[in-house]
Amino acid sequence: MQTLAENLTSQAISPTLEKLILTLANTSKEISHAVRHGALAGVLGATEQENVQGETQKKLDIITNDMLKDALKADGTVRGIASEEEDYVVEADANGEFLVCFDPLDGSSNIDINSLVGTIFSVLPAPAGELTEKSFLQAGRNQVAAGYVLYGPSTMLALTTGQGVQLFTLNPETNEFLLTNGAMAISKDTGEFAINMSNQRFWEAPMQTYISDLLLGKIGPREKSFNMRWIAAMVGDVHRVLCRGGIFTYPTDNKNPEKPYKLRLMYEANPMAFLVEQAGGKASTGYETIMDIQPTEIHQRVAVILGSANEVDACLEYHGIDYSEEPVL
């Protein structure tokens, strides 16, 4: 099997980007080790701190954030860093070519129950001049690489450099990432959807109607049955979509009118959208393509609808309907 390093060489990417990706991959091996040891290493549980999102930080959130931050600052290829766990951007190497945005441990609410978690990352070109938050405010189309590492029964790395999506599995005996799928492809049609149904009453009318029609199955307007899946970690739900198709959505809701969106654009939605599009799927907010959004802040949140192309299109058709005369279910 081809190693990650061998695969990157075959992609003919720049040596600096190759070095950066290998640094991310090597750090994820250390994170995988920390996740596996869990309670044995005393890294489970919550701290008394909150991140910039107002979310209580888990011990592993902080540990994994520091692992990635330290590795990227020492790498020499990175100009600056933006993380879910950092209030502000972090300077790295003044001569670095890239900016890295990451969620160090997506799905951290799953940590204490020994369920799926992962690391999500996005790589952008570093513009010339002083490093500021504005340096990071680039549309997702500017990404030069993106991926995630899933810490499950196996540790897996899904990666794109704009040349399709490759899946690597960590060999625990050699500690090497080996290529196990050289061309991930999302099926255009699906019978699975992933959504947090507990928020149904807070969704916009288009999403309420769309999901209601899915639940009606063969007797409804879609005339087919759908199964629901929900892992409560974007990285796990998107991994399933990449492996066997499906639609994943965390839509707009009015549960907290000041925070109508859940997922962060720069280090969750954009990298996942890049992966999904490279695998033949689609990614939208319901009203615009995710990777076309011009960010206004590094911790900006957006609605997310992504997955099998035909099913995303079907969902978007509901968002094109005038619901002004329709009752909200």
Curated annotation (Swiss-Prot):
Listed Gene3D superfamilies: 3.40.190.80, Fructose-1,6-Bisphosphatase, subunit A, domain 1
Disulfide connectivity?
none
Query: GO molecular-function annotation terms?
Result: fructose 1,6-bisphosphate 1-phosphatase activity; magnesium ion binding
Q: Does the keyword rRNA processing apply?
A: no
Instruction: Give the residues the record marks as binding Mg(2+) 2.
Output: 103, 106, 268
Q: What is its EC number?
A: 3.1.3.11
Q: Which cofactors are named for this entry?
A: Mg(2+)
List keywords of the entry alphabetically: Carbohydrate metabolism, Cytoplasm, Hydrolase, Magnesium, Metal-binding
Please give the CDD domains that the UniProt record associates with this protein.
Answer: FBPase
- So, what pathway does this thing act in? Carbohydrate biosynthesis; gluconeogenesis
Where on the tree of life does the source sit, at the highest rank?
Bacteria
Positions with a binding annotation for Mg(2+) 1:
84, 103, 105
List localization entries. Answer: Cytoplasm
- What is the enzyme's main class? hydrolase
Q: Per its UniProt record, what Pfam families does this chain match? A: FBPase (PF00316), FBPase_C (PF18913)
The cofactor note reads: Binds 2 magnesium ions per subunit.
Q: Which GO terms describe its cellular component?
A: cytosol
The subunit structure is: Homotetramer.
Q: What PANTHER family does the database record attribute to this sequence?
A: FRUCTOSE-1,6-BISPHOSPHATASE-RELATED (PTHR11556), SEDOHEPTULOSE-1,7-BISPHOSPHATASE, CHLOROPLASTIC (PTHR11556:SF35)
Full protein name: Fructose-1,6-bisphosphatase class 1
Q: Could you tell me which species this protein originates from?
A: Shewanella pealeana (strain ATCC 700345 / ANG-SQ1)
